From Swiss-Prot:
Annotated RNase H type-2 domain residues: 34-223
Region of interest: Disordered: 209-229
GO cellular component, one term: cytoplasm
Binding site for a divalent metal cation: 40-41, 131
Catalytic reaction annotation: Endonucleolytic cleavage to 5'-phosphomonoester
Gene name linked to the record: rnhB
Source species: Rhizobium etli (strain ATCC 51251 / DSM 11541 / JCM 21823 / NBRC 15573 / CFN 42)
EC numbers: 3.1.26.4
Name by which UniProt lists this protein: Ribonuclease HII
Localisation: Cytoplasm
Length: 229
């Protein structure tokens, strides 16, 4: 007889579509931790621009409908949910520039941005749920790293949307300063258009020089100068 795979096996877990919910937050609350924040980042893979992190504490009575991993949503739907999240939740955003990424590495820069976002929440979190494998060091509260967290926790999903929309807006603003690379179209990812721009014009000050295939860049404005008001 063929052996059946347990229902909680990693194989089935990876193949069954997940819908984020509030169960992890309620579990933390039952353990005495409240409020609970979700945290996520956007922009680990691009060749240019910052990595942006967001931390979100949702109001259980005002959770926007349709929260999901930002990558599963259209740009229009992300924008709609972004507005709703800002109107109903406690939100904090932080970023690490391309310079910071080059000085350390993308993992450390991402975790540092996430730490600063969490620590800057107007309402201090009692517990944090983070997407991925790591909880940022240096927090004032305990936390839990959740693999595929943006597909499991609505708080992490909300943070993923805030981080993604914020970063996309920053890169659209960057396009106005550096129009030769098409940042508004690809947000700094290594598309054919972007690589062609680098080949023709060389890198600018927003490029991550520690990422292949980049070389020494030019002077120019830092990403903080491009954050939309």
């Amino acid at each position: 007889m063929k052996r059946r795979t347990p229902p909680d096996s990693p194989l089935l877990f990876d193949t069954v579509p997940l819908v984020p919910d509030f169960k992890l937050e309620l579990k933390a609350r039952k353990a005495g931790h409240w409020p609970v924040a979700g945290a996520d980042e956007a922009g680990r893979g691009p060749l240019a621009g910052p990595v942006v992190a967001a931390a979100v504490i949702l109001d259980p009575k005002r959770i926007p409908e349709g929260l999901n991993d930002s990558k599963q949503l259209s740009a229009q739907r992300r924008e709609e949910l972004f507005v709703q999240i800002l109107a109903t939740a406690t939100v904090s955003i932080a970023s690490s520039s391309s310079t910071r990424i080059d000085e350390t590495d993308i993992r450390k820069a991402s975790l540092d941005a996430m730490r600063r976002a969490i620590c800057s929440l107007a309402i201090p979190a009692s517990y944090v749920l983070t997407d991925g494998l790591d909880v940022p060091p240096g927090l004032d509260c305990p936390g839990q790293a959740v693999v595929k967290g943006d597909a499991r926790s609505v708080s992490i999903a909300a943070a993923s949307i805030v981080a993604k929309v914020t970063r996309d807006r920053m890169m659209a603003r960057a396009h106005n300063v550096f129009p030769d690379y098409g940042f508004a179209a690809h947000a700094g990812y290594g598309t054919a258009q972007h690589r062609a721009g680098i080949e023709k014009h060389g890198p600018c000050s927003l490029h991550r020089m520690s990422f292949r295939p980049l070389r020494k860049g030019e002077d120019g404005p830092e990403m903080d100068e491009l954050i939309p008001e």
